[in-house]
Design a protein with these regions (language model features):
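Redox-cofactor binding/interface segments in oxidoreductases and associated redox assembly factors
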Residues: 31, 74-75, 98, 155
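Beta-strand-loop-alpha-helix segment that lines the small-molecule cofactor/substrate pocket
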Residues: 72, 78-131, 145
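N-terminal Rossmann-like dinucleotide-binding module
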Residues: 1-47
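Contiguous beta-strand/loop segments that form the cofactor/metal-binding neighborhood of enzyme cores
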Residues: 164, 173, 192, 196-285
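Short, well-ordered coil/turn segments that N-cap beta-strands
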Residues: 24, 50, 71, 94, ...
Length: 287
């Protein structure tokens, strides 16, 4: 694993998910930006000193050369490092699992696509919400044609944790790098949670977005990246959609909600009740 040391939000999530079925074992890591703390970080994860690395480049080279080396790496760093780490790992013959977004810019995404094709290795991107059973059931309902031809898709992802400029406090690591264009990339809220919204829309509907009209705003004064996003969508086939992503929705925690409407009815799923899927039929009782 690259990243995921003390203070990381997503690193421990990757670790727990990897160990659920006992088929994956973390054998090496470069967990900290501070080289002086890398051994302690590795020890906290139960790694021997020789498999804890001060630098991700050193780790990739060493693990690729070992007969018992890592088979793939998980990238849990800020966004600006996603491409360089993935590029070097793929070139060294390692498979890659990366936290979203894949890259910080569109140009980097194109380069990553070419790197993956040339390497012959697998590349996975962790859009976690598509793993919920009810999200997969929603996709199957749409695929069967139960709703009829799709007409409209609405997705909303609201958080309130950035309603204040906490990135300036100096003691909120997660907010600090997400508000820094040099580390987060060109998109703030849209790159952090808007990508989840976009992913679940295409995953469930089976449609592809063909055009967008986007209003990206920085609501908190002085913030350098967008923290509120309102996007009109057009899909192939003519369906319409709306994507709302906000991190200044004061009081909201992690409110991802998806609604899909067809000729015969619509379905409604919310992350706050992930085991519940509601189908509202035009000419039949709600299920």
């Amino acid at each position: 694993m690259v990243g995921g040391g003390a203070g990381s939000f997503i690193g421990p999530v990757h670790r727990m998910a990897a160990e659920l079925d006992r088929e994956i074992e973390m054998v090496a890591g470069a967990f900290r930006r501070d080289p002086a703390k890398y051994l302690a970080a590795g020890a906290a994860w139960g790694l021997p000193p020789e498999r804890s690395y001060a630098d991700w480049r050193e780790m990739i080279a060493a693990e690729a050369a070992r007969p018992d080396g890592a088979q793939f790496i998980a990238i849990t760093t800020p966004n600006h490092l996603h491409l360089p780490i993935a590029r070097e790992a793929l070139a060294a013959g390692l498979h890659v699992l990366c936290d979203k977004p894949a890259t910080a810019t569109l140009a980097e995404a194109v380069e990553l696509r070419d790197c993956v094709k040339a390497s012959g290795r697998l590349y996975g991107l962790t859009h976690t919400y598509t793993g919920y059973p009810m999200v997969r059931e929603a996709r199957e309902i749409v695929r069967r044609g139960d709703l009829g031809a799709l007409r409209k898709v609405v997705v909303e992802y609201s958080q309130g944790w950035l309603a204040e400029p906490i990135e300036r406090s100096g003691d909120h690591k997660q907010a600090t790098w997400r508000a820094d264009p040099a580390e987060q990339g060109e998109g703030g809220c849209i790159g952090d949670i808007g990508v989840h919204s976009f992913n679940i829309v295409e995953f469930v509907s089976g449609l592809q977005v063909s055009r967008v009209c986007a209003d990206l705003s920085s609501v908190v004064p002085g913030r350098r990246l967008d923290d509120d996003c309102n996007v009109l969508l057009r899909f192939d086939g003519g369906a319409r959609g709306v994507l709302i992503a906000s991190q200044i929705a004061a009081g909201d925690r992690n409110g991802l909600r998806l609604r899909v409407y067809g000729e015969k009815g619509g379905l409604d799923w919310s992350h706050e009740q992930p085991d519940r899927l509601t189908i509202n039929w035009l000419k039949a009782p709600t299920q």
